[in-house]
């Protein structure tokens, strides 16, 4: 290195730039270190489902598969591309998760660098990228940095905008590099459309509108702007591309692959509570935190205030020069995305959560960076210095998330259960979704979990009752052979359809709120669930016009007997009555205060035995079996036996 070159690097205005790179490296390293040490404590079923899908894809050499029941989207440009590749060489699921997270965050930061370079503000990249490398909000750290659910969405937005602004900056000149970039943008749009509606609503449709309105304005004024027309041409092609991807998704992919259909779109009346929810969701995504006036909360909300100041200045100081058209496009894109998302939530879809708006909120980072760097004002150094101070305040607030999270542990009981299953060579488990795939990840795939939508729907005699959501399709075809563990939370036990079977044995493991019951096979569990030891004759007050004698119940003419007020899950049942004079009886099941529940079909009946079948569609409380003597003589009831048949 020459002396002159070295002096240039150490030039006064380069020192802050170099320090900003040090800050970015520190922020990125801190995040990856935190994730490597603590991610196991924050796992949930959704996170583990994504890793399980990647493991399946690693053996099929593809990016999508028919072996999987997808949730609401078939995500093409998603984390499985890299994560499944890592599974080919690494057995530890934890190592795969940490490496995949590190790679995807690095790719997201690189996409942001590409955007900054296309906007010609790359010197601001390291400082503002540090914001993206640290927890902006609870939603961002949970669903982006740790969960990675929507991290690819941000990456796609940044890459696409970088390609778009490169296209805008070439002034109609064509070369191979620029043409390749333009084609790449159209391919990204098409692949994004293959993933469903989300990216279209959040990003592509708002961007198309931003490019469409200037052309319409020129048309109405009778003028023509070549720049507007060229950008609109780009918008038309990319929007056609994304629509082609969506059409292929709706009419082909959603038919070939199992995925939840969006069949709940309706026009709805205005509801101010929905508007309140979305405003609060937006604020939360900016980092606002409720709670006591403690150090971490104060720092987070100071950071939130800093973001508000930066956003307000940026949105009200859009560069006005003609060559700064990209500033207006980027700013209006953010505003249009927020407005469109809010309108959809108000009048069409309301099953939303705070994290759905996060990708739109993240657009504020390039918007603020670009507008502050390019806005025309006299005291530029003062504004720049103030902006840097505000950024540091936000960074200080972001770091406190790690301070708050360092002692939290949400998966301790799951880790204990996972260790128990491994030590006892139990390869399969039954649970609801939220207690399912997380066990598979914690055992490095050694325990295969079958999960249902709710504890009430756990029908172990019918595999099709399993939820077709984020698990292998083969699960819905047959139950496994070998030892199985039923894993349920304390709040689920009273409502599970397996309650009868579980009440007959002590739990094999209790880990905080998780209960584990081990059975030698699925058949053993089915048999335990099927046979009910009814105490039908437990109380004489449930006998009208009759009497008890030595454990036998007698009914006079028009007398009736009922009991035992038990809870039964939905399903089919067979009731067998033994005694004398049963030719003259009738039978009816009821629930709660004699409420009619189900017709009973007579299978067979003679003087000594009567067999009936009936079913409950749903879980039923306080079920009673009413037996009525319809004859003229006395009826003797010796026993009443109940078996669940399906």
Regions flagged by a language model, labelled:
Residues 423-458:
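Short periplasmic/luminal acceptor-recognition loop of GT-C membrane glycosyltransferases, typified by
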Residues 37-45, 58-81, 94-95:
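Membrane-proximal lumenal/periplasmic loop motifs of glycosylation machinery
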Residues 25-29, 99-123, 159-163, 312-313:
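Transmembrane-helix motifs of polytopic, lipid-linked glycan transferases
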Residues 178-208, 244:
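Membrane-interface alpha helices of multi-pass inner-membrane proteins
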Residues 49-55, 69-92, 281-290:
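Short hydrophobic/aromatic helix or loop-helix immediately within or flanking a transmembrane segment
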